[in-house]
Design a protein with these regions (language model features):
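Amphipathic, oligomerization/interface secondary-structure segments
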Residues: 1-160
Length: 160
């Protein structure tokens, strides 16, 4: 996916300054900054907290926020469930190990190579970017409007 044109437009939009625009721009800036973090464990945590931040202005656990993100970036219930399972698995198997058990990502069984780690980090970056673009193009300017639109999307997907 070539995100460059959409990302550029979001980063440098001179006509919007609302709370949704700011969180979208903030998320893209964090994705860009993540490339400069030399440690993969810290990169993962940085990106994961970005996912949490774009889902809601208040802290929510993964069970609550994952549906908020997923509903904007999938087209059907099958993909909704698939992405939801992926996020739940990564939260349990990776985030918990890094954040609560103090492990390094490269010490986890599935991430013993840089290729495996980079693949996972890229997946997370793409989820963030897909969400940001989907939200930005709605033109929605407040979290209240965003929640209402999200509920409509979830109804269409049959996942509420």
């Amino acid at each position: 996916n070539d995100y460059s044109k959409d990302c550029y437009q979001i980063l440098y939009d001179r006509y919007r300054n609302d709370e949704i625009y700011k969180i979208c721009r903030y998320a893209l800036q964090r994705v860009a900054k993540s490339y400069y973090i030399p440690d993969s464990t810290n990169t993962f945590i940085f990106l994961w907290t970005t996912l949490e931040a774009i889902a809601s202005p208040e802290y929510e656990n993964v069970k609550k926020w994952k549906g908020k993100v997923i509903s904007f970036i999938v087209q059907d219930q099958t993909n909704y469930n698939k992405l939801g399972e992926y996020i739940k698995k990564i939260s349990k198997d990776v985030r918990t190990e890094l954040v609560h058990n103090g492990k390094l990502i490269q010490d986890l069984d599935d991430y013993s190579t840089m290729l495996a780690i980079d693949k996972e980090l890229t997946k997370i970056k793409n989820i963030i970017i897909d969400y940001v673009i989907a939200v930005y193009i709605t033109g929605i300017k407040s979290f209240t409007e965003l929640d209402n639109h999200r509920k409509e999307l979830q109804n269409k997907l049959g996942v509420n």
